[in-house]
Amino acid sequence: MSYETVLTERRGETSGILWVTLNRPEKLNALSMTLFDELRQVFQQARTDRSVRCVVITGAGRGFCAGADFSGGPAKELVYASQESATDLEGARLFFRNESETYIALKRLDVPVIASVNGVCVGAGLDMVAHCDMAVASTAARFQVAYVKRGLFADLGGFYSLPRIIGWRKAMEMMTTGRFMGAEEAHAAGLTNYLVSPDELEAKTMELALAVEAGPPLGQKLGKMLAYRTQGMDFESALEFSGIALGTTAMSEDRNEGRRSFAEKREPKFTGR
């Protein structure tokens, strides 16, 4: 399926990697209503496609994502209109709801999701990276919680994910000052798994995605689910969930393949069954 503002490509040894590119380079991939809608469609379709083992999200051109596009339409009401001159606040609320539904669809993906951050990454773009499971960034990347600079807190869940990744103090600094964080500082804080030169970004991201693609899909999905669902649980309750997941994978074909490949001293070929 073709889109106006999103490029999709299947890559990998089994074509199990869904490579998603935000494609508004002239706007630094700012998220318009159309881009939000098309991303949501991509994520929803990926969730029901068993052949997808990993999703990669990146940006075309020199930026990853400059946040939501507030240059026109109902989104403009959120930033530029005064209380007296606002004419389409209902449209602005609809825009925010569409944004939220797109990120809910992203979080619902049960396969690992990797952000490949090639440049500027602010506002809703940073939220997107925070909602991914892993991230690879180039040294050209810069990160910012931009909402506070506009007197807003129209955050798309970054307040939820960011403190869990980089820690409370760093997240609070970003959310209350709006200062840019460079690639090196962001990597040191734990926002990214790998930091490479711009020329190495795609290759390093592909290396990580291929490692994910080669893994056991059932075990990966259950592991991701447990990591998220058990946050806030007590230890014993979390172990109960883990026991259920262990029992499920123990009865799978992939478990048998893992055992055979170990005995035969070869790399396993997992099928997700």
Where in this protein do the model-derived segments appear?
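C-terminal long alpha-helix characteristic of the crotonase
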Residues: 136-141, 192-240, 244-253, 269-273
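Structural motif
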Residues: 31, 116-117
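Glycine- (often His-adjacent) and acidic-residue-rich active-site loop
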Residues: 59-102, 121
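Conserved CoA-thioester-binding segment of acyl-CoA-metabolizing enzymes
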Residues: 1-60
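Terminal low-complexity tails and localization/encapsulation signals of metabolic enzymes
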Residues: 1-6, 260-273
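Acidic, divalent-metal-coordinating active-site segment for phosphoryl/phosphodiester hydrolysis
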Residues: 178-185
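CoA-thioester-processing core
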Residues: 102-110, 116, 122-176, 189, ...
